[in-house]
């Protein structure tokens, strides 16, 4: 019994930093409120270039893979690279909070989704399911895009993947596919994607400047 107790204490001390993941409770509660309340009387998001981007249902796959991609990045850094975990959370949480504030103060949405599908397959069925669970509101900056960039930055800066070019390349490919998917399945306007890139650029520099470990601290903390 004593050994089990000591083991639990050791695990708690080693991974006590994961408490900051409780932010997701705040985020999901706030986002859920916005999804329920921002249904009409919102500002329409649209750029002319949106009309030239065709609907392609196959991109629903990388769009859904985003959930696993983000979960992997957070879990891996939490377990193996505490300093990178803190930097990643600082990046993600700031952008997600900015998104919530914008959506609250400036309710927004789009009408880019197709009214009907000219053909049906498993991918259009997935799109139909996605449309039924996610309203076309609360759009910018796109969290799908912003968080994908954050995870890729974490992979590129993690000491664990420094010499694993295949992992870095796979992360880049998936990140790009996810970003494209937001537009090809008509979940986001180019405006949402562009604003996500702008915010990511700012936060990338801020996180590196203020939360990077100093050389004498070492690159990794377990």
Where are these regions (language model features)?
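Hydrophobic, membrane-inserted alpha-helices
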Residues: 69-73, 150-153, 174-179
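Hydrophobic transmembrane alpha-helices
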Residues: 152-157, 200-208
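Conserved small/polar residues in nucleotide/adenosyl-binding loops
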Residues: 210-216
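Membrane-interface loops
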Residues: 35-48, 78-166
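N-terminal transmembrane-helix/juxtamembrane module of multi-pass inner/ER membrane proteins
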Residues: 2-70, 118, 127
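Interfacial helix-loop-helix junctions of multi-pass membrane proteins
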Residues: 139, 178-201
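Aromatic-anchored segments of alpha-helical transmembrane domains
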Residues: 28-29, 96-102, 173-183
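Membrane-embedded alpha-helical segments of multi-pass membrane proteins
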Residues: 65-69, 146-147, 194-198
């Amino acid at each position: 019994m004593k050994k089990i107790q000591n083991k639990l204490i050791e695990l708690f001390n080693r991974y006590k930093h994961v408490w900051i993941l409780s932010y997701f409770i705040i985020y999901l509660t706030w986002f859920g409120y916005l999804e329920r309340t921002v249904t009409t009387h919102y500002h329409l998001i649209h750029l002319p270039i949106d009309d030239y981007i065709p609907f392609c249902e196959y991109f629903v796959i990388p769009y859904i893979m985003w959930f696993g991609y983000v979960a992997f990045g957070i879990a891996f850094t939490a377990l193996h690279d505490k300093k990178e975990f803190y930097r990643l959370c600082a990046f993600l949480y700031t952008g997600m909070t900015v998104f919530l504030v914008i959506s609250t103060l400036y309710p927004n949405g789009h009408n880019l989704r197709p009214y009907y599908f000219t053909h049906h397959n498993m991918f259009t069925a997935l799109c139909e399911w996605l449309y039924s669970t996610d309203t076309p509101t609360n759009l910018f900056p796109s969290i799908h895009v912003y968080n994908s960039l954050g995870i890729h930055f974490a992979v590129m800066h993690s000491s664990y993947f420094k010499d694993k070019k295949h992992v870095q390349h796979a992360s880049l490919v998936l990140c790009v596919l996810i970003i494209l998917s937001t537009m090809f399945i008509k979940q986001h306007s180019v405006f949402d994607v562009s604003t996500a890139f702008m915010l990511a650029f700012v936060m990338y520099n801020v996180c590196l400047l203020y939360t990077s470990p100093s050389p004498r601290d070492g690159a990794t903390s377990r």
